[in-house]
């Protein structure tokens, strides 16, 4: 994770600096990064780091923006979904709510911070893979309240038409994205397995499972934290 945290610091500093300041090595010159070996951001082998990029950096961005008092926590996760069987493989990340800041509400149903990813169009997804996209809607009310509210997350349900191996890596399932300066926290995310009878079974934030044809995964992504009372 050594290079990962440096990129997060540069990203946050770049966002907070005036736009006319050029992005170059000089941005780091005044900074002294103290990250002791063996800590979360600088682990020793054999520490598990499989989600160090996609998950840890989202939490780190929230921490850094909050430390400067600039923004409440966004969803804090990439909501990673991957599935496949003997003839297809697919990977996506699902957007959520952004954190609010002084003078602006959080983004609604968008990837925030260093994500740089887009979802496959529903028509393309269903034509190329044995799945049916049953819901893809805003999760109304999941953003934290405040003078400037946090953004709402999303609900996304994918039903599999063939047996499928599914993996989920997601955060903010137990600890909600925090508000700032009296703003309320956003809602935690949820992962659910829907069986063929439509019964919902809660899943942990990180899980790998085998689904039968006709079963589905529903992901409720976190909302962002609110800013101010």
Can you say where each PLM-predicted feature lies in the sequence?
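Glycine/proline-enriched, intrinsically flexible loops and inter-domain linkers
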Residues: 2-229
């Amino acid at each position: 994770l050594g290079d990962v945290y440096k990129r997060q610091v540069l990203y946050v500093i770049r966002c907070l600096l005036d736009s006319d300041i050029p992005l170059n090595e000089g941005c780091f010159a005044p900074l002294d990064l103290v990250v002791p070996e063996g800590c979360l951001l600088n682990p020793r082998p054999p520490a598990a780091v499989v989600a160090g990029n996609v998950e840890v950096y989202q939490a780190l961005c929230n921490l850094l923006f909050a430390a400067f008092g600039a923004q409440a926590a966004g969803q804090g996760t990439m909501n990673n979904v991957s599935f496949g069987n003997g003839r297809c493989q697919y990977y996506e990340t699902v957007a959520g709510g952004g954190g609010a800041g002084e003078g602006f509400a959080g983004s609604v149903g968008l990837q925030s911070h260093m994500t740089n990813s887009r979802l496959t169009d529903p028509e393309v997804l269903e034509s190329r893979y044995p799945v049916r996209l049953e819901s893809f809607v805003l999760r109304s009310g999941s953003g934290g309240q405040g003078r400037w509210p946090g953004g709402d997350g999303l609900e996304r349900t994918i039903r599999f038409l063939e047996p499928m191996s599914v993996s989920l890596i997601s955060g903010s399932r137990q600890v909600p994205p925090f508000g700032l300066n009296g703003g309320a926290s956003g809602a935690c995310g949820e992962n659910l397995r829907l069986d063929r009878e439509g019964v919902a079974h809660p899943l942990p934030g990180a899980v790998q499972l085998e689904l039968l044809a006709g079963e589905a995964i529903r992901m409720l992504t976190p909302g962002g934290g609110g800013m101010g009372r």
